């Protein structure tokens, strides 16, 4: 009985501490993307309820990856997972229909500004080419094996309180692929109110961020990992022949991520549900970061001022 009481008490403490997330609803899980940034950035995103987060502005680059990946998955996937327990029943297989539907979802949200409006229209031709590049490279690796897309994986280490949840882009019985699309860049034309778009070059080495995400899927699936970058012209494949993709290095990166989450969880538990105390424990947001704190919603700007006393530079 005592053990039961203790567990109940502990559960309540956890619930109280994590109530800083999702407008009081708490946190169901960590994800790679939620833990890959500084804690301050996590707080000013995930402390808001989901319906509020959905209204936050984000530019064409995030949309580009979804447009390409979702289209390719529907074109060549044999199974697509909707949730961790539910697969898609059936889906459109015709390229034009898939692409237009995906584009429609993106365009439901108004562009952030004129520059973004231009980019969202112009990116379409780049996305079509990028779909072709992606489809080909995935097919070359998967060959005739059954291809599973968006497979949900969860994992929890040591004394972690919350699981890490992720979705694997492409999975077969032997391999998995983490696919990174490099969206085109947009630049202002000198002395004019116009913009131009150009292909973003592919990296020559895999980035630590992307390797860490790959390491999580590797630890969950134990399959042969591939990290692939694509743009509208070409692709580059990193597999286990690459020094940084070897088992030891992936494990090292995975446990580094776990350590970071364990630290965050200790801080959260220590602050017992006080967001302002937690904010004082972590480094204030670096407002000059090239992209972390651009395009903030008014609610987020207000929260930053409340928690850290930082006023927005206009």
Language model regions located:
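Conserved catalytic cores of phosphodiester-cleaving nucleases, focusing on short active-site segments
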Residues: 68, 164-200, 217
């Amino acid at each position: 009985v005592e053990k039961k009481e203790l567990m109940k008490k502990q559960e309540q403490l956890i619930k109280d501490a994590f109530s800083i997330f999702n407008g009081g609803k708490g946190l169901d899980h960590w994800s790679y993307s939620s833990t890959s940034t500084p804690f301050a950035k996590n707080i000013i995103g995930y402390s808001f309820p989901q319906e509020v987060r959905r209204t936050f502005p984000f530019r064409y680059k995030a949309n580009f990856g979804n447009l390409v990946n979702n289209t390719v998955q529907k074109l060549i996937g044999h199974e697509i997972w909707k949730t961790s327990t539910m697969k898609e029943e059936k889906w459109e297989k015709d390229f034009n229909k898939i692409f237009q539907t995906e584009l429609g979802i993106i365009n439901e949200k108004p562009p952030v500004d004129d520059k973004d409006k231009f980019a969202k229209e112009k990116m379409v031709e780049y996305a079509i080419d990028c779909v072709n590049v992606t489809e080909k490279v995935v097919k070359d690796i998967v060959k005739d094996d059954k291809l599973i897309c968006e497979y949900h994986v969860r994992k929890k280490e040591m004394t972690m309180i919350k699981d890490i949840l992720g979705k694997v882009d492409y999975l077969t019985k032997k391999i998995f692929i983490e696919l990174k699309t490099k969206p085109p860049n947009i630049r202002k034309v000198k002395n004019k109110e116009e913009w131009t778009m150009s292909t973003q070059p592919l990296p020559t080495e895999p980035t630590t961020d992307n390797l860490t995400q790959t390491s999580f899927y590797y630890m969950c699936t134990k399959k042969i990992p591939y990290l692939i970058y694509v743009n509208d012209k070409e692709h580059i494949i990193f597999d286990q022949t690459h020094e940084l993709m070897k088992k030891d290095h992936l494990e090292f990166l995975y446990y580094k991520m776990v350590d970071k989450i364990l630290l965050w969880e200790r801080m959260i538990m220590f602050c017992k549900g006080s967001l302002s105390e937690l904010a004082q424990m972590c480094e204030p947001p670096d407002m000059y970061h090239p992209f972390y704190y651009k395009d903030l919603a008014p609610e987020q700007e207000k929260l930053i001022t409340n928690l850290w006393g930082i006023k927005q530079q206009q």
